[in-house]
């Protein structure tokens, strides 16, 4: 029996790792065996204009945000790359042999890219976005998954409510490259005919015929669900997420607390109260929210004094969430950046090298914060109009989710004090409106310096530190 390997603490993440010959030991990949962490192939199912691409994009964004490398493969885009100019619905007729040949070629090209992503590039989840309306096509994709050691999970979107279908058709017509510069009525007519091309051969997932498959069926954008054979943790998270999202029009308002006494001094963390300007901002925020005349607005804060003081000025009920508390800076709490550089120069440099994954000694990383904030995202997806009064790092994490920002970009998103961001979800993304409430505040944003080397001089480490008292 081999002797136990030596452990050493990773300086960036502060986790213990086995070492071999002075180097971190890597876990052997066992992709051929379907373990809990083997790749997952999500297969969309449904007629056109049923919200499949909306679901695909939203699911991809969520999984990437929680740290699961995910990519969407839209077969329609592969078709557009091959057939440069879309002419009419006749391309999709079941007796159009040339069309059938090209569509199959596109599906196989997309699956080839799925294999490359999951088996060679370190991807964990691939979302295969196409109609996949026949049992034969789904069997082909399932076999592809089995041959490559992937778990396959089907997501079917069914819409029978004519109002939902009509709304989806408008969204598709507005956003599809197939109908750019086409007359609106002509585009609608063509798209309706395209849907008819699929309807006669459409075979929905069946509780008896498909009882061995893992799937979720979503009826009328979340009115009801059928869930079958959820196989592992990642599939259960996918189901939970899909059962929380909705398409009701709403806005989410994000802002930080008013300027705090420690903000003025350039000190991070702590639990200080508001500065005089911070209290002034609270009054301006109350007036802004009143002027917006928002129906059934929910207000959430952290459990820290500065967010609660800010919310008190609104004179409305609010809910305190511990998970909305600011990132825990551990041993660096209430220190200035200059003091951190002076006392912990190695830590300061490591954080600049990888700000997302760096964990403060006895504290948290942005990566930890994202995991902590997942329940907030789930609840924001369930709710309608919400104002979240939070903190700089927390606001960055929430903003990165809604704007689909990469982990490397997340810790540098600008979230200034005394500014409200109004987020309005739209078809395949989020519209952002930034509203400054005309109360001056200190700048707390620090850009990544050019020199992130451990041996850098102090003046180069501190070059991007904002001015403070």
From Swiss-Prot:
<feature type="binding site">
    <location>
        <position position="194"/>
    </location>
    <ligand>
        <name>beta-D-fructose 6-phosphate</name>
    </ligand>
</feature>
<feature type="region of interest" description="6-phosphofructo-2-kinase">
    <location>
        <begin position="1"/>
        <end position="249"/>
    </location>
</feature>
<dbReference type="GO" id="GO:0006003">
    <property type="term" value="P:fructose 2,6-bisphosphate metabolic process"/>
</dbReference>
<feature type="site" description="Transition state stabilizer">
    <location>
        <position position="391"/>
    </location>
</feature>
<feature type="active site" description="Proton donor/acceptor">
    <location>
        <position position="326"/>
    </location>
</feature>
<feature type="active site">
    <location>
        <position position="159"/>
    </location>
</feature>
<feature type="binding site">
    <location>
        <position position="396"/>
    </location>
    <ligand>
        <name>beta-D-fructose 2,6-bisphosphate</name>
    </ligand>
</feature>
<feature type="binding site">
    <location>
        <position position="355"/>
    </location>
    <ligand>
        <name>beta-D-fructose 2,6-bisphosphate</name>
    </ligand>
</feature>
<dbReference type="InterPro" id="IPR027417">
    <property type="entry name" value="P-loop_NTPase"/>
</dbReference>
<keyword id="KW-0067">ATP-binding</keyword>
<keyword id="KW-0418">Kinase</keyword>
<feature type="binding site">
    <location>
        <position position="173"/>
    </location>
    <ligand>
        <name>beta-D-fructose 6-phosphate</name>
    </ligand>
</feature>
<feature type="modified residue" description="Phosphothreonine; by PKC">
    <location>
        <position position="444"/>
    </location>
</feature>
<feature type="binding site">
    <location>
        <begin position="348"/>
        <end position="351"/>
    </location>
    <ligand>
        <name>ATP</name>
    </ligand>
</feature>
<dbReference type="GO" id="GO:0005524">
    <property type="term" value="F:ATP binding"/>
</dbReference>
<feature type="binding site">
    <location>
        <position position="428"/>
    </location>
    <ligand>
        <name>ATP</name>
    </ligand>
</feature>
<dbReference type="Pfam" id="PF01591">
    <property type="entry name" value="6PF2K"/>
</dbReference>
<feature type="binding site">
    <location>
        <position position="263"/>
    </location>
    <ligand>
        <name>beta-D-fructose 2,6-bisphosphate</name>
    </ligand>
</feature>
<keyword id="KW-0511">Multifunctional enzyme</keyword>
<feature type="binding site">
    <location>
        <position position="198"/>
    </location>
    <ligand>
        <name>beta-D-fructose 6-phosphate</name>
    </ligand>
</feature>
<keyword id="KW-0808">Transferase</keyword>
<comment type="function">
    <text>Synthesis and degradation of fructose 2,6-bisphosphate.</text>
</comment>
<feature type="binding site">
    <location>
        <position position="131"/>
    </location>
    <ligand>
        <name>beta-D-fructose 6-phosphate</name>
    </ligand>
</feature>
<feature type="binding site">
    <location>
        <begin position="46"/>
        <end position="54"/>
    </location>
    <ligand>
        <name>ATP</name>
    </ligand>
</feature>
<dbReference type="InterPro" id="IPR013078">
    <property type="entry name" value="His_Pase_superF_clade-1"/>
</dbReference>
<feature type="binding site">
    <location>
        <position position="306"/>
    </location>
    <ligand>
        <name>beta-D-fructose 2,6-bisphosphate</name>
    </ligand>
</feature>
<dbReference type="InterPro" id="IPR001345">
    <property type="entry name" value="PG/BPGM_mutase_AS"/>
</dbReference>
<feature type="binding site">
    <location>
        <position position="351"/>
    </location>
    <ligand>
        <name>beta-D-fructose 2,6-bisphosphate</name>
    </ligand>
</feature>
<feature type="modified residue" description="Phosphoserine; by PKC">
    <location>
        <position position="29"/>
    </location>
</feature>
<dbReference type="InterPro" id="IPR029033">
    <property type="entry name" value="His_PPase_superfam"/>
</dbReference>
<feature type="binding site">
    <location>
        <position position="337"/>
    </location>
    <ligand>
        <name>beta-D-fructose 2,6-bisphosphate</name>
    </ligand>
</feature>
<feature type="binding site">
    <location>
        <position position="79"/>
    </location>
    <ligand>
        <name>beta-D-fructose 6-phosphate</name>
    </ligand>
</feature>
<dbReference type="GO" id="GO:0006000">
    <property type="term" value="P:fructose metabolic process"/>
</dbReference>
<keyword id="KW-0378">Hydrolase</keyword>
<feature type="binding site">
    <location>
        <position position="366"/>
    </location>
    <ligand>
        <name>beta-D-fructose 2,6-bisphosphate</name>
    </ligand>
</feature>
<feature type="binding site">
    <location>
        <position position="256"/>
    </location>
    <ligand>
        <name>beta-D-fructose 2,6-bisphosphate</name>
    </ligand>
</feature>
<dbReference type="Pfam" id="PF00300">
    <property type="entry name" value="His_Phos_1"/>
</dbReference>
<dbReference type="GO" id="GO:0004331">
    <property type="term" value="F:fructose-2,6-bisphosphate 2-phosphatase activity"/>
</dbReference>
<feature type="binding site">
    <location>
        <begin position="392"/>
        <end position="396"/>
    </location>
    <ligand>
        <name>ATP</name>
    </ligand>
</feature>
<feature type="active site" description="Tele-phosphohistidine intermediate">
    <location>
        <position position="257"/>
    </location>
</feature>
<feature type="binding site">
    <location>
        <position position="269"/>
    </location>
    <ligand>
        <name>beta-D-fructose 2,6-bisphosphate</name>
    </ligand>
</feature>
<dbReference type="InterPro" id="IPR013079">
    <property type="entry name" value="6Phosfructo_kin"/>
</dbReference>
């Amino acid at each position: 029996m081999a002797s136990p390997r030596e452990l050493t603490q990773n300086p960036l993440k502060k986790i213990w790792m086995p070492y071999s010959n002075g180097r971190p030991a890597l876990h052997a990949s066992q992709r051929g065996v379907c373990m809990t962490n083997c790749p997952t192939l999500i297969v969309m199912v449904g007629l056109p204009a049923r919200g499949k691409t909306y679901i695909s994009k939203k699911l991809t964004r969520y999984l990437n945000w929680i740290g699961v490398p995910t990519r969407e493969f839209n077969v329609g885009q592969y078709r557009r790359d091959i057939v440069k100019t879309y002419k009419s619905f006749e391309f999709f007729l079941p007796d159009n042999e040339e069309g059938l040949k090209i569509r199959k070629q596109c599906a196989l090209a997309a699956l080839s890219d799925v294999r490359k992503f999951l088996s060679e590039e370190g991807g964990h989840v691939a979302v295969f976005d196409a109609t996949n309306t026949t049992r034969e096509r789904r069997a082909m994709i399932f076999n592809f998954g089995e041959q490559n050691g992937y778990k396959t999970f089907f997501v079917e979107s069914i819409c029978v409510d004519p109002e939902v279908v009509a709304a989806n058709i408008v969204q598709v017509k507005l956003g599809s490259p197939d109908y750019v510069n086409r007359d609106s009525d002509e585009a609608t007519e063509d798209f309706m005919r395209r849907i008819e091309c699929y309807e006669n051969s459409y075979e929905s997932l069946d509780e008896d015929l498909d009882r061995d498959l893992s799937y979720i069926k979503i009826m009328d954008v979340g009115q009801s669900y059928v869930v079958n054979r959820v196989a592992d943790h990642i599939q259960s998270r996918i189901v939970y997420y899909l059962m929380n999202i909705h398409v009701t029009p709403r806005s989410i308002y994000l802002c930080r607390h008013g300027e705090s006494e420690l903000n003025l001094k350039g000190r991070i963390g702590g639990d200080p109260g508001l500065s005089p300007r911070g209290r002034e901002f609270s009054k301006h925020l109350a007036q802004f929210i009143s002027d917006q005349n928002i129906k059934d607005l929910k207000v959430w804060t952290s459990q820290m004094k500065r967010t609660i003081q800010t919310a008190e000025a609104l004179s409305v009920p609010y809910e305190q969430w511990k998970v909305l508390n600011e990132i825990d800076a551990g041993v660096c709490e209430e220190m200035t950046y200059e003091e951190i550089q002076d006392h912990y120069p190695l830590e300061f440099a490591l954080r600049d090298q990888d700000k997302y994954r760096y964990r403060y000694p006895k504290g948290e990383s942005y990566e930890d914060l994202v995991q902590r904030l997942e329940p907030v995202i789930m609840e924001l997806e369930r709710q309608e109009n919400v104002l979240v009064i939070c903190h700089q790092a927390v606001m960055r994490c929430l903003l990165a989710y809604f704007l689909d920002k990469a982990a490397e970009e997340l810790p540098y998103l600008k979230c200034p004090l005394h500014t409200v961001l109004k987020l309005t979800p739209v078809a395949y993304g989020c519209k952002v409106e930034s509203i400054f409430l005309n109360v001056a505040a200190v700048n707390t944003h620090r850009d990544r310096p050019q020199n992130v080397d451990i041996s850098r001089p102090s003046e180069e480490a501190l070059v991007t530190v904002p001015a403070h008292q």
